[in-house]
Amino acid sequence: MKIRMKQTVSMLLLTGFGLAAATEAFSAESLQDVMKRRNLSQQDLLAASKTYVPTGKRDEFMAFSSGGQSGQIIVYGIPSMRILKYLAVFTPEPWQGYGFDEESKAVLRQGNIDGKEINWGDTHHPAISETDGKYDGQFLFINDKANPRLAVIDLRDFETKQIVVNPIFKSEHGGAFVT
């Protein structure tokens, strides 16, 4: 038992020293060294710096991208292109609890058509709410291309609040437009 413990401690110490040496070698590298090692130009560095957002800082803009047949919306930051959130809309999402509590089940049931439960969608063409023709960022609307429905997402908490069925159409390939 003691021999095994000594071997384990020795291995951990050697690993620690190896990591420390490697970290020191990379941290001593200058910007010019990195540019040379990776064959980067000044233009490459400028392009990278235009999209870089340090940890803890916020992106200047957010984009709302339709998730297509996932029935979701993907929110990502610009310029970093980091995925900020997946918004559950027409499809239950077990990993975030959407469609598994009474509140979100009730929202999904609003999208039932002729009493038939439809727990899937094809999200396309999001639109942001406007006041006097200017974006106000209060709500996001998104079309379900496979079924005649539209969803309303509250941008204060990024949750789907309402699914509105269009009783006239059977399906639509339209989009959400705010007027």
What spans do the regions from the language model cover?
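Bacterial N-terminal signal peptides that target proteins for export
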Residues: 2-12
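Beta-propeller domains
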Residues: 66-110, 142-167
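Structural signature of eukaryotic scaffold interfaces centered on beta-propeller domains
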Residues: 36-58, 98-136, 175-179
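Long, well-ordered hydrophobic secondary-structure segments characteristic of membrane-embedded
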Residues: 131-132, 140-144
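Structural hallmark of WD40 beta-propellers
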Residues: 60-63, 137-141
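Bacterial N-terminal signal peptides
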Residues: 10-20
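Sequence/structural signature of beta-propeller modules
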Residues: 12, 24-75, 79, 85-101
